[in-house]
Regions:
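Short S/T/G/P-rich N-terminal loop/turn motif that feeds into the first structured element of a domain
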Residues: 2-111, 115-125, 139-270
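A short mixed-secondary-structure module that forms the rim of ligand-binding clefts
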Residues: 125-129, 133
């Protein structure tokens, strides 16, 4: 997204929770594995990658209080309609399931994936995208942020199917941290999938759009293909989760952790 409204944080910090762990409703779903296509993949299609790199794009929105629900629906439907631009590998937008940790009061999320940075750039300036931002997003949102990164070695479905749960984590690092510390953080997050079998996919990388990211420089997405029940199973392993968090906690200045369930096309609106 090109729109960014930088406002003062609306919440005090919650407890730092830099790695993928949470709980709540269960939405189990099955996913099917197909060959990696050369064309666009819709927001509900699932295909597999045999160790590939994708460009991740996540936008967080705070809808103004007391906004007419019909206008919120229009925004969500407009964002999901951007799959028609034939530039995305995957795109989903809708209300957040839960805020685990954040100094900001975000309400909605857009997650999309692209083959290349050029595809993301083309999406960003596309008239269809700009129209949705101008007509449906800016009039009802008083805060927006976006983070972009390249996820290398990603395997599994490129497009999580409806009912899949994702945990989005953004990390703001303490000043003057060296490359060694950044590398350690990235390796710890990459290793989560091997320690928690419920995590179906981990995408992590360094943000390459700093102007829009409020100072958050490392981002990750943990995908739970069978839904929130898998997320809850991971959250129940408190001691193991604490061990992983403690490995990087000293490097962190601020953390955003948000949970989201990929909606069906019919239920994407709020």
């Amino acid at each position: 997204m090109t729109a960014t409204v930088c406002l003062k944080a609306t919440r005090s910090f919650l407890k730092l929770n830099p790695l993928p762990f949470s709980r709540s409703l269960s939405h189990p779903k099955h996913h099917h594995f197909l060959s990696f296509p050369k064309t666009r993949i819709s927001n509900f299609a699932t295909v597999t990658m045999s160790s590939s790199s994708v460009v991740e794009h996540i936008v967080l929105f705070k809808v103004k209080d007391d906004t007419d629900p019909s206008k919120v629906n229009s925004m969500v439907n407009g964002l999901n309609g951007l799959t028609s631009l034939d530039l995305t590998l995957h795109l989903t937008a809708g209300p957040l399931l839960r805020t685990r940790s954040s100094p900001f009061a975000f309400t909605h999320l857009l997650h999309s994936r692209y083959k290349t940075k050029d595809d993301l750039a083309a999406y960003t300036v596309h008239p269809g995208h700009l129209s949705v931002v101008k007509e449906s997003v800016l009039p009802i949102c008083d805060d927006v942020m976006a983070v972009d990164w390249v996820a290398d070695g990603l395997t599994g479905p490129v497009g999580p199917s409806p009912g899949s749960a994702i945990r989005v984590t953004f990390l703001k690092l303490k000043e003057e941290l060296g490359e060694a510390a950044k590398g350690e953080i990235l390796e710890v997050i990459k290793g989560i999938k091997g320690k928690f079998g419920e995590v179906g996919q981990i995408s992590v990388g360094e943000n390459f759009s700093p102007a829009r990211a409020k100072g958050y420089s490392i981002a990750s997405v943990a995908v739970f293909f069978e839904g929130v029940s898998e997320m809850e199973a991971v959250d129940s392993k408190e001691e193991l989760a604490k061990l992983e968090k403690d490995k990087v906690r000293e490097y962190l200045d601020s953390v955003i952790v948000l949970d989201y369930v990929v909606p069906s096309p019919q239920s994407a609106s709020l």
